[in-house]
Amino acid sequence: HGTIESRTVRLVVDFIEDFAIELPTLDDLTRISRVSARSLQIAFRRELGCTPSEYVRRVRLNRARAELLTPQPGTTTVSDVASTWGFYNPGRFAMLYRNQFGEQPSQTLARALGT
């Protein structure tokens, strides 16, 4: 059963990586994997040590960081990048970002801009 579980997780991970900009929900993930939310959560915990939702959040944060590290001078803002990746509460985005990367998103952007 581990190999089916592994294949299911791989399928869902690939989907998340390909469609992260569309902010996939747990319903989307269960639909493409054809397993229940509970089964998917168990498989993710076993294979990756996190839930599908946590994995989606991690991917979205990584994509936001990539944008902050390669800004368009004068046009890239932390709030625009955050909302692009589905983070609509600036304080929550800053907290999640700091927890994952050890710095504020504004620090990442300032460093990338050389300011």
Regions found by a protein language model. Name each.
Residues 7-9, 112-115:
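C-terminal intrinsically disordered extensions
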Residues 38, 44, 71-109:
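Sequence-specific DNA-binding recognition helix
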Residues 32-35, 54, 59, 86, ...:
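A general, composition-driven signal for non-globular sequence regions
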Residues 16, 23, 43, 47-63, ...:
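Alpha-helical DNA-contacting segments of helix-turn-helix folds
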